[in-house]
UniProtKB/Swiss-Prot annotation:
Alphabetical list of InterPro entries matching this protein: YbaB-like_sf, YbaB/EbfC
Biased composition (Basic and acidic residues): 56-65
This protein's GO CC annotations: chloroplast; chloroplast envelope; chloroplast stroma; plasma membrane
UniProt protein name: Nucleoid-associated protein At4g30620, chloroplastic
Subcellular location: Plastid, Chloroplast
Family: Belongs to the YbaB/EbfC family.
Keywords, ordered alphabetically: Chloroplast, DNA-binding, Plastid, Transit peptide
Transit peptide: 1-48
Pfam family, one: YbaB_DNA_bd
GO molecular function list: DNA binding
Ranges for region Disordered: 45-65
Length: 180
């Protein structure tokens, strides 16, 4: 019984600024409700605060902000992020299609061999001149490798530039290391 009196005194001192305050304080009192419960003959009091997180409203309006409370309208944020992801996916597919039809030619020294790759680094064709064929298989192998490396570097550079342009068009800051 002594603990109940101590708890009551504690809450009275906690609520003392509301007892004879100004109008703003009196309106704040509407959000504090004392609950009386009888439990096995004892009169226990508990304090419920309805003012936090938008609880305790009498009108049941279905506005997003009152439902979300202090966190804001999470549903609208989720939908905005979802739309942004869809835009990124659509633009990325568009860039991939552009790269798939683009062709990049690579040459060896003396342009005896020409290798053509797509923007997705897929080989399309290899052109070998008669002069390169006369050099022998070992030298021809080196020339084809050199031309392939040249075409590959041009294709990768073009892909990075297009992806960087895509990132900048979507509002990402320029110069991200992962895109260059």
């Amino acid at each position: 019984m002594a603990s109940t009196a101590t708890n009551t005194d504690f809450f009275k001192t906690l609520l003392s600024p509301f007892s004879n305050g100004n109008a703003a304080q009196r309106s704040s009192r509407q959000n504090i409700v004392w609950l009386n419960r009888k439990q096995s003959g004892n009169n226990n009091r508990s304090l419920r605060v309805n003012g936090l997180f938008g609880g305790g409203k009498k009108d049941n309006k279905e506005d997003g902000q009152s439902k979300a409370g202090i966190l804001g309208n999470m549903q609208n944020l989720y939908e905005t992020v979802k739309k942004a992801q869809m835009v990124v996916q659509v633009e990325a597919v568009r860039v991939q299609k552009e790269l798939a039809v683009a062709e990049f030619d690579g040459y060896c020294q003396g342009e005896l061999v020409k290798v053509t790759l797509s923007g997705n680094q897929q080989p399309i064709r290899t052109d070998i001149t008669d002069a390169a064929m006369e050099l022998g298989s070992e030298k021809l192998s080196l020339l084809v490798t050199e031309a392939y490396k040249d075409a590959h570097s041009k294709s990768v550079l073009a892909m990075k530039e297009r992806m960087s342009d895509l990132a900048q068009s979507l509002g990402m800051p320029p110069g991200l290391d992962g895109l260059k």
